[in-house]
Amino acid sequence: KRGFTMYVWLALVITLAIVIGAKVFVGKWPVLRQRFGIQSPTEYLKTRFGQPAQLTIAISGVIMKLLDIAAKWAAIGILLHGFTGIPVWAGVVVSGLVSMIYITIGGLWADLVTDFVQFIVQLGAGIVIAVGVGTALSERGLSYLTMWGELNTIQPGFSNPFNGDYTMLWCVLYLFAKTFEYNGGNWNLAARFISTANASEARKAAVLSATMYLLWPLLIFAPMWAARLLFPNLADPASELYPLLTQTYVPTGMVGLVLAAMFAATMGMTVSDINTLSAVTQRDIAPAFSARFRSMIEQPRTSLRIARVITVCFTVITIVIGLNANSFGGVLSLVISWFGAMVGVTGVPLLLGLFRTFRHTDGRVTIGSVVCGFLAFALTKLLPDFPSDWEVATPLIVCAAVFILGGLVNRALGRDVRTDADALLTTLAEPDRVDVLTP
């Protein structure tokens, strides 16, 4: 619908967000595992801010991630409908059930393998589609570089970096939100960084991810931009265009592989999310309410069984939400207006809590910052004329302001920093000089 701006606000913004994180944030995540033995992203918050703040962030984050995962089910339902003609609701249910079985049995390792294999298949298919569309353009005397003039005649502004609601201000504010999300505010990404060997390896992973975000979307988006010229009369381009490109330019036997890869890509994201939700619930939320549960998770077999039950329950909930995605404004609204706006509210204390600079921000201030962030989010939804540029970033800005100002007030009042929290922050201050504990 909007053209080149999609690459700017999605690919370029996220690339910059991850580059910033590679320098500032991600090196601290493996240190938490090496030095303090944490496994879930919110586990360290108990030492840093106390259990009430940890629970507030963990429970809030679980609710948000359920919306994000549901949006992914809805998205794959739309794709399956475009490829096969099955109803969208059936695609959501089938995707959810297959993924539930897969992640329950295979865990995070199965997710990593799926991610790698689906990328290889998608890379091959993406190249085939790009070459096929490029050939079709050349038959019209055009190329990917020269097609923009004709595209702009069909829809003025199609080649603009900022188009419609996606203004320069919107992109700058979105960068602010994505910097927190893609460097640990989104828990499944924090889990990936936690699982790297050390701070240096975490940074390398971030740089590789940023590079792929810069290059890979061009291979996917360029044929779809060009397809506005090749297939100008589609009734519903959002659901018809990519399946039509695949069926037109990819050899018949490979179409099934592309569909499988798209399915696996969605499954790779969702199972990673659900795996992390299960870890947070099992290690950080449930033990706070039950001494019996705390003792149960110390037993490996029992712990695994509990994790699988939690995984199944969460998957069912997200399928139900995915079936009702239109109630939230559709897939894009779920991803941007709901999850994208709220993830920073829990991401601010999760990431800024890693830095000694903010050591005077305590648990009470942290809970207050999260509450204020969610109130700001509610305000953006309740006010009918709230500026679209500020919708995503406002909750995060409010949360960050309360978090930082509250810490400054504590410092001015001379309130002490907890000894265990201060020791944690001192260790994190130099992530490359950590003595690695033997597992």
Predicted regions and their residues:
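Helix-loop-helix module between adjacent transmembrane segments
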Residues: 9-103, 174-182, 264-272
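Hydrophobic, small-residue-rich membrane helices and short re-entrant helix-turn-helix hairpins
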Residues: 37-46, 107-116, 182-215, 237-241, ...
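Hydrophobic alpha-helical segments and their helix-loop junctions in multi-pass secondary transporters
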Residues: 69, 73, 77, 81-94, ...
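Transmembrane helix-loop junctions in multi-pass membrane proteins
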Residues: 5, 67-79, 103-109, 223, ...
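Membrane-interface helix-loop-helix modules in multi-pass membrane proteins
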Residues: 1-37, 170-182, 189-233, 247-266
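Loop-to-transmembrane helix boundary motifs in multi-pass membrane proteins
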Residues: 48-55, 66, 282-326
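Terminal cytosolic tails of multi-pass membrane transporters
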Residues: 367, 387-439
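Central hydrophobic cores of alpha-helical transmembrane segments
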Residues: 364-376
